[in-house]
Each structure stands twice: as structure tokens, then as C-alpha cells.
Amino acid sequence: MTEAGSTDRLHHWLTGAAAVAKQAGQLILELYEEQAFETYHKDDESPVTSVDFAANRLIVDGLAALTPTIPILSEEGSHLAFAERQQWPRYWIVDPLDGTQEFIARSGDFGVIIALIENHQPVLGIIYWPPGDVLYTAQRGRGAFRTD
């Protein structure tokens, strides 16, 4: 694929993944405002909520529809061995609710993070902050942007 074709493909994926991040963020914000969630603890004793899992499902489904052949590595998903993951030429990394402790504490400091990795290098990045409806995006070769 030409460099221009690769850049256009990445931009298409960035646009789609940003829409998925915003959808997840809106779900997170609704449940935050309603205080409609349960809290659990992972094996490492860090907190996780039912909102983490709900946002994860939405994001994984959205990314799988956008890019069906690209694997997804999520903080709240299956934990595959590094030996397997290191062979992937391209994959998504997802933190469906970054700042779970802050979410629980109701500080408003939480967000959705999605990145696309190609050949062990980040090529796309998305951070969405639902309380302020602020979206940050970055694409290799095109720069980083904030959208309010």
C-alpha cells in the first residue's frame, strides 16, 4: 500500500475509533451521573467497576466492526501471553475507563483511551474526557488535535 493509502486508511480508522470512544464515554457519563455501577477488585486489588466492563464491551464491539482482522488488547479483556501478542503486526490497545479510582471517587478525572499499534509503534491515539466532552486524537504523520 502507498504511503498516501496507508495515511488515508489510518485516518478512516482514527475517525471510526474516535466515534467509538465518544459512544463509550457517553455511556460512562450516563452511569456516572446516575451512580449506577458496582465496584469490584482485580487480583492485584485495583478497583474495577461494572462500567469498565460495559464500556469495554461497547469499544471491543465497535473496533471489531471497524477492523475485524485487527486484534484488541484491553485492560478489561482476556490477558494473552506476551509471546503471542509480540507476533501481532498490528493491534488495538484499550483502556475503557482510565481513572477508575477517580470515577469511583467522583472527581471527574477519567476517560477513554484507545491506541493502534503497528510494528510495535503507536500510529493512532485517542483520549476522550467525557465530563468535558473533550476529544484528543493523534495520527502518525498528521499531528495531534484537541476537539471541544
Language model segments and positions:
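N-terminal subdomain of lithium-sensitive/metallo-dependent phosphomonoesterases centered on the IMPase/IPPase/PAP
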Residues: 1-97
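DPxDG-like acidic metal-binding loop motif
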Residues: 85-145
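Anionic-ligand binding region
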Residues: 148
